[in-house]
UniProtKB/Swiss-Prot annotation:
This is Beta/delta-urticatoxin-Dm2a. Expressed in trichomes, that are stiff epidermal hairs located on the surface of petioles and leaves. GO terms for molecular function: sodium channel regulator activity; toxin activity. Belongs to the urticatoxin-2 family. Keywords: Disulfide bond, Ion channel impairing toxin, Knottin, Neurotoxin, Plant defense, Secreted, Signal, Toxin, Voltage-gated sodium channel impairing toxin. Its main location: secreted. The presence of 'disulfide through disulfide knots' structurally defines this protein as a knottin. This toxin contains 2 'disulfide through disulfide knots'. It is found in: Secreted. It comes from Dendrocnide moroides (Gympie stinging tree). One of its GO terms (biological process) is defense response.
Length: 131
């Protein structure tokens, strides 16, 4: 009984920390309806929700990740929290140096993880230059 309460508190603490860090950037909404805590991040990121439900003597915690909105982060937009695959085609996430989506301009080195800007191509798969 103590361990399930500890798990619920741990999940609630992690969720609260995620919501606070997300709220600081102004892109999240937290809704508390009768102790059911839901977090929603709109726009270019997915929607996550955490629900703490009271089921008799036990509390059950479910962390759900809803479907992605099929949107991506474009040039100069933050990719923090959405990972390298969250940038639009033709862009890569500069994580951890700046955590924004970028593309490689003409004449600069490129490769599989550093894609050229629209209209340009890389002379090599792993290593080359944008032309």
């Amino acid at each position: 009984m103590k361990s399930s309460a500890t798990v619920v508190l741990l999940v609630a603490a992690v969720t609260a920390a995620m919501v606070m860090s997300s709220s600081a950037s102004g892109d999240a909404v937290m809704i508390d309806e009768h102790n059911n805590i839901m977090t929603s991040v709109e726009g270019k990121r997915g929607i996550g929700s955490s629900v703490v439900a009271n089921g008799g003597n036990r509390k059950m915690a479910n962390v759900l990740l809803s479907g992605w909105e099929n949107k991506c982060a474009g040039h100069g937009e933050s990719c923090l929290g959405i990972g390298i695959s969250g940038c639009c085609k033709g862009y890569y996430c500069s994580w951890p140096s700046g955590s924004i989506c970028l593309c490689v301009p003409k004449g600069d080195p490129c490769g599989a993880m550093h894609t050229c800007c629209d209209g340009l191509s890389c002379t090599g798969f792993f290593s080359g230059d944008c032309v």
